[in-house]
């Protein structure tokens, strides 16, 4: 569960990435959350990273990536809205920390149907991505632009990146990615795996986020990028 400040910071970073493609500076985050020092921002970012909501990209300035969003509104928002007079459902709008009550005759919020394309290995590779099994209806702000699909994670090779066995990962379709991105890789047109991309000269390395698994290195003609991780859903 996130605190209100943690939730507000996560939403602020997410909205800024959607608008500009660049994370906000520490000064901008400090001002947005009305904090007196940057040390408070550092603590909030560390807490979000430990909980698997964001990750810091190595060797890049202002490099933050939102891995997933919480399943529900910030703690205390609904109670504050209802003034203690019973339950009053609330939804999050696009701007930071703003909520509005659900009206009975209001049209339902727009959703995007994302196909679940089977299972993906976060461990030893499995056979190539299976055919569509069902769909997830997700809010557009969770996805951003582009075409997306979802996969169920099997294995524990990405646990240090906050990705656990049984999670559902949201993937934006693409055939290129930056080094350091977590990707869906198709190896030899047979094996599908979820790993972090590293480039070593002309070769491609698929790196696990678990020391129990070795990095696998391939020639560039053996690996095809199917998409890049943009979000994660976890059920408790």
UniProtKB/Swiss-Prot annotation:
Active site: 157, 195
Organism: Azorhizobium caulinodans (strain ATCC 43989 / DSM 5975 / JCM 20966 / LMG 6465 / NBRC 14845 / NCIMB 13405 / ORS 571)
Gene this protein is translated from: lexA
Protein name: LexA repressor
Similarity comment: Belongs to the peptidase S24 family.
Top-level class of the enzyme under EC nomenclature: hydrolase
Record-annotated DNA-binding residue ranges: 26-46
Gene Ontology terms, MF aspect: DNA binding; serine-type endopeptidase activity
Reactions this protein catalyses: Hydrolysis of Ala-|-Gly bond in repressor LexA
A Gene Ontology biological process term: proteolysis
CDD domains in alphabetical order: S24_LexA-like
Subunit: Homodimer.
Site positions (Cleavage): 122-123
Record EC number: 3.4.21.88
Keywords: Autocatalytic cleavage, DNA damage, DNA repair, DNA replication, DNA-binding, Hydrolase, Repressor, SOS response, Transcription, Transcription regulation
Function comment: Represses a number of genes involved in the response to DNA damage (SOS response), including recA and lexA. In the presence of single-stranded DNA, RecA interacts with LexA causing an autocatalytic cleavage which disrupts the DNA-binding part of LexA, leading to derepression of the SOS regulon and eventually DNA repair.
InterPro entries for the chain: LexA (IPR006200), LexA-like (IPR039418), LexA/Signal_pep-like_sf (IPR036286), LexA_DNA-bd_dom (IPR006199), LexA_repressor (IPR050077), Peptidase_S24_LexA (IPR006197), Peptidase_S24_S26A/B/C (IPR015927), WH-like_DNA-bd_sf (IPR036388)
Phylogenetic placement of the source organism: Bacteria, Pseudomonadati, Pseudomonadota, Alphaproteobacteria, Hyphomicrobiales
């Amino acid at each position: 569960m996130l605190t209100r400040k943690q939730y507000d910071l996560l939403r602020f970073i997410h909205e800024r990435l959607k608008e500009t493609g660049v994370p906000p500076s520490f000064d901008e985050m400090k001002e947005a959350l009305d904090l007196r020092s940057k040390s408070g921002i550092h603590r909030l970012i560390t807490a979000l990273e430990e909980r698997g909501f964001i990750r810091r990209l190595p060797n890049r300035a202002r490099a933050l990536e939102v891995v997933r969003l919480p399943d529900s509104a910030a703690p205390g928002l609904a109670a504050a809205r209802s003034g203690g007079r019973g339950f009053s459902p609330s939804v999050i709008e696009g701007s930071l920390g703003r909520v509005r009550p659900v009206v009975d005759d209001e049209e339902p919020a727009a959703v995007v149907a994302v196909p679940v394309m089977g299972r993906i290995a976060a461990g030893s590779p499995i056979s190539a991505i299976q055919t569509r099994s069902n769909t997830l209806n997700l809010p557009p702000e969770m996805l951003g632009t582009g075409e997306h699909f979802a996969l169920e994670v099997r294995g524990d090779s990405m646990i240090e990146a906050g990705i656990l066995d049984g999670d559902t990962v949201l993937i934006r379709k693409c055939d290129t990615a930056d080094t350091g991105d977590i990707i869906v890789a198709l190896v030899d047109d047979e094996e599908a795996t979820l790993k972090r991309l590293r480039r070593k000269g002309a070769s491609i390395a698929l790196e696990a986020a678990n020391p129990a698994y070795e990095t696998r290195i391939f020639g560039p003609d053996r690996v095809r990028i199917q998409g890049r991780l943009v979000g994660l859903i976890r059920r408790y």
